[in-house]
Amino acid sequence: MAVQQNKKSRSRRDMRRSHDALTTAAVSVDKTTGETHLRHHVTADGYYCGRKVINK
């Protein structure tokens, strides 16, 4: 089992963790239906960029 040789300070630990923060998902509202969806993704009812692209 690995054991550290020297103690890492709180500052070093927190500097390492500075890149671990989560970001929120970019959500858009469709022009025609007003439905929220992820950016660059088709909505649940098949619209993309205001056009119907998938027929159910």
UniProtKB/Swiss-Prot annotation:
One Gene Ontology term from the biological process aspect of the record: translation
GO molecular function, one term: structural constituent of ribosome
UniProt entry keywords in alphabetical sequence: Ribonucleoprotein, Ribosomal protein
Ranges where the record places region Disordered: 1-27
InterPro entries named among the record's database cross-references: Ribosomal_bL32, Ribosomal_bL32_bact, Ribosomal_zn-bd
GO cellular component: large ribosomal subunit
UniProt entry tagged with the keyword Ribosomal protein: yes
Basic residues: compositionally biased ranges: 7-16
NCBIfam families with a match to the protein in the record: rpmF_bact
Family statement drawn from the similarity comment of this UniProt entry: Belongs to the bacterial ribosomal protein bL32 family.
Protein name: Large ribosomal subunit protein bL32
Species name: Actinobacillus pleuropneumoniae serotype 7 (strain AP76)
Phylogenetic placement of the source organism: Bacteria, Pseudomonadati, Pseudomonadota, Gammaproteobacteria, Pasteurellales
